[in-house]
Amino acid sequence: MSQVIEPQLDRTTYYSILGLTSNATSSEVHKSYLKLARLLHPDKTKSDKSEELFKAVVHAHSILTDEDQKLRYDRDLKIKGLHTYQPKKNCHIFKTKAKESQGASPTLGQSEAYHRQNKPYEQQPYGFGVGKKMTSSSKSKVPIFKSFNLKSYQRNHYYSSKKERKHGSPDIDSLFHETNGASKVRMTDAGKMDTNSQFQEIWEILGKNVYTHKSYSEDPNSCLGSALSDHEEEEEEAGKQQQQQQQQQQQQQHYGMTSKSSSPDEEQKDNKESKRESRVSPEENGEEETGHKQFKLPKTSTFSSGSHDSNLQSPFYNHEYRHYARSKFECKNQFRKSVSPIKEIPATTSTNEGWNILRDIIEKLNISNVDDRNKDLLFRRDEIGDKNHSDSIDIENLSIKEPKGMKRRKKDDISLEELFQSLPREKDYFMMDAINDSLESINLFKKPKTTQSHEQGGTFAQAESNRAKFKPLLEQCGITPEILDLQIPEIPEFDAVADLETLKLNVQLFNNQCNKLKETIHQVSLQRLRADTQFSDMLTQKQSIMVWKTYLEFDKSLMDKLNILQERQMQVIKIFSERCDGKV
């Protein structure tokens, strides 16, 4: 059997041959060409159509890569309406078709063919080529990323080989494990194992005695022990969740109890009666009892409910909860930061006494500082008639005294008293009105100017005077920029006017507006002509060339506006003449 590719291409346009639209770039064209050329090359495929299609792909690529030919082809596509053509969806899908070779023997169907089973190496049949190659559907459905456990593999292999030797004994491993690896052992709400009829059949056939769950979990070779050990963590978590739910229910019942609560003796009697009712005699239901004993798990809870029942006033369920809360509180206090000094400290007798002592010391220090300052020679207070004077110091009444041992200043120097009088007093703003006069009165030593500086100053002043001369005003030159903002009247709509008289009136009104605008433009141009003749000597110099250019640009804009106005007048006259002749 040999496989042959059956190519299918959309040969409507060169773009559709390559599986592209007309908006495709050169890189996309090249990529699709390489892809199709690899698939349709005659050396690669044995199809009869591949050679013809390969030539078509090469021709399409040669045209679309040449810029001139591509432009012509795109123009032709727009004319034909194929510029937005999309390639067909069922094309560019290469299907493989099985081709029967001559002299081949008829083969069996897929259902009749022999499939090699997924077995270990030691269990596979001898010889090669016995079975058919595995297809994707016949492959193993075991997940690839599943973790491999060597012990479980050996245990499963041991029980399977034991089963084959006994010929008829039940496969224990297959009964205890589901197909997906999950255990058939299930937990009930009460924390006990659920039994099945399959388990009862196993124990009847094997004739084994009843063991507790502890014996199975301790035996590493037993399949039941492995199944239970695999789910110990899940069962413990389920048991913890059930205990938490029971604790919450008991707390709700405790807080919602009425005053008619039963005594502890009555509660113990009720508990004993409920336990007796829940127990079933082994004679009445022996099979259920044996099944529960076989799969009974040890209790994982270490909390006793009797302590909470005895002490209903305590918010904790038992002493272990209380111990946990106490240790958590102590740990939190241990790592707590120190109290902030900004926070208010509760007033006590000891703290008040300390603050009062500090306050008295500060007041005494302030009084001593004031006395020392009064005794100093540098500060002398003037005599005041009133004895009950305030402690506030007035700057105006103070006088500064020279210390002993200091030389007398010269008469030309400014004394401290004069300086004190000249300085601004307290709360007086410094006025800067007479600062210019004071600066002019100061005699500064000025260096005499050199000849070079005199020449530079003269040239600079001359240039400034020349600039002032060569900069006449815009009004003197006849430039009025406001005239450029004047709007030219628009051509009226004569199609809506049917009467000839009204048409004449509209034409006259338009002509009058245009004539007024022409008159203003001619006046401005006449002023410009006079200004050019007047300032001809000034404008022809080197400094005023740029100014002259701006004047000429203004004249040009005036003439452009005048030309537009005349063209509109010509259009109106043409329309009016046609209406009068009756052509329109």
From Swiss-Prot:
Gene Ontology CC terms: endoplasmic reticulum membrane; nucleus
J domain location: 13-77
Classification via SUPFAM superfamilies: Chaperone J-domain
Region (Disordered): 216-312
Record field: compositional bias (Low complexity): 241-253
Keyword field contains Flavoprotein: no
GO biological process: cellular response to misfolded protein; chaperone cofactor-dependent protein refolding
GO terms of molecular function: Hsp70 protein binding
Pfam families linked: DnaJ
Polar residues composition bias: residue spans: 299-312
Compartments, record wording: Cytoplasm; Nucleus
Compositionally biased residues, Basic and acidic residues: 269-282
Domain of life: Eukaryota
Keyword list, A-Z: Chaperone, Cytoplasm, Nucleus, Phosphoprotein
Phosphoserine sites (modified residues): S229
The keyword Cytoplasm belongs to this UniProt entry's keyword annotation: yes
Misc note: Present with 184 molecules/cell in log phase SD medium.
Name listed for the protein in its UniProt record: J protein JJJ2
